[in-house]
């Protein structure tokens, strides 16, 4: 039995959970999330806790136990507090700005790159070089942050590019000249 899966998920106030079979819907102050869980688990609710249990001791059920518990816990966390990812743009002339809901990134190309957010995701820019991606869905926030980083990944020689805040870029030495 999964150690992660054994832990009950506590429901904060203002969070409402409904499930039919393997389909779960979580509503909260930050939005509403819906997901269909894989086969092999069952959900039960007791007062302010949700329990995820494997339906049998087969390998697939045991594999999905911890995963499903984490997915549901992330949904509850997302609709109550939300998730954020912060990115930094490093380099001369590289900057970002928000036009409407679209993020426009100037990252050294001949044209600015536009990133349109999916529903529920918002972009915020501070100081033209710090981008903040927020939303209730952890997976979607991470995917959008990865798309923005992929526009110009950091290079190892000068460290220029788009990186996550706090990400360590391993630097390389440049060419060594003749001695």
UniProtKB/Swiss-Prot annotation:
One GO-annotated biological process of the protein: cytoplasmic translation
Keywords of the record: Ribonucleoprotein, Ribosomal protein, RNA-binding, rRNA-binding
GO MF annotation list: rRNA binding; structural constituent of ribosome
Keyword Nucleotidyltransferase: no
Zinc keyword on record: no
Record-level GO cellular component terms: cytosolic large ribosomal subunit
Membrane-spanning parts: none
Task performed by this protein: This protein binds to the 23S rRNA, and is important in its secondary structure. It is located near the subunit interface in the base of the L7/L12 stalk, and near the tRNA binding site of the peptidyltransferase center.
Similarity comment text for this entry: Belongs to the universal ribosomal protein uL6 family.
HAMAP family, A to Z: Ribosomal_uL6_B
Subunit structure: Part of the 50S ribosomal subunit.
Protein name (database record): Large ribosomal subunit protein uL6
Species of provenance: Prochlorococcus marinus (strain NATL1A)
């Amino acid at each position: 039995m999964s150690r992660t899966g054994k832990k009950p998920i506590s429901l904060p106030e203002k969070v409402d959970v409904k499930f039919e079979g393997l389909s779960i819907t979580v509503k909260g102050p930050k939005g509403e999330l819906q997901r269909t869980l894989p086969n092999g688990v069952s959900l039960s609710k007791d007062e302010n806790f949700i329990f995820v249990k494997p339906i049998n001791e087969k390998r697939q059920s045991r594999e999905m136990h911890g995963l499903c518990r984490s997915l549901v816990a992330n949904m509850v966390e997302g609709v109550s507090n939300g998730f954020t990812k912060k990115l930094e743009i490093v380099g001369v002339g590289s900057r970002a700005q928000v036009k409407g809901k679209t993020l426009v990134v100037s990252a050294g190309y001949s044209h600015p790159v536009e990133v349109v957010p999916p529903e529920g995701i918002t972009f915020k820019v501070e100081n033209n070089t710090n981008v903040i991606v927020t939303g209730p869905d952890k997976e979607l926030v991470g995917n959008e942050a990865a798309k923005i980083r992929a526009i110009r990944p950091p290079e190892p020689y000068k460290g220029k590019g788009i990186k996550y805040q706090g990400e360590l870029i391993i630097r390389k030495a440049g060419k060594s000249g003749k001695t």
